[in-house]
């Protein structure tokens, strides 16, 4: 099993994070791409770095979006090499 290509940083109680999770889950399921979700409240360094920007998505380890996830843009990032 390969590493997840998409990482979603968020925290509990964040409604934008819940919206982002639904989009990421749908796009990744459609494309057969793995993804993971990380709660930034469990890591002080991540909280410092991303606390004001969540939800933050990374594609292949690079920051892709923050605050909102654009499904078309995410799909494009995952299908272009």
Residue ranges and their predicted role:
Residues 33-44:
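Thiol-based oxidoreductase modules, predominantly thioredoxin-like and allied folds used
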Residues 2-5, 31-33, 80:
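Long, contiguous secondary-structure blocks with strong helical propensity
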Residues 55-63:
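A short, hydrophobic beta-strand/beta-hairpin element that forms part of a small beta-sheet core
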Residues 42-55:
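Short Fe-S-cluster ligation motifs
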Residues 73-81:
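Thiol-/selenol-based redox modules, centered on thioredoxin-like
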Residues 1-27:
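Local sequence-structure signature of Cys/Sec-based thiol-disulfide redox active-site neighborhoods
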């Amino acid at each position: 099993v390969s590493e997840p290509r998409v990482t979603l940083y968020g925290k509990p109680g964040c409604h934008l994070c819940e919206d982002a999770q639904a989009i990421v889950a749908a796009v990744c399921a459609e494309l057969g791409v793995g993804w993971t979700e990380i709660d930034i409240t469990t890591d002080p360094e991540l909280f410092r770095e991303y606390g004001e920007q969540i939800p933050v998505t990374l594609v292949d380890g690079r920051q892709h979006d923050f605050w909102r996830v654009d499904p078309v843009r995410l799909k494009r990032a995952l299908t272009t090499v």
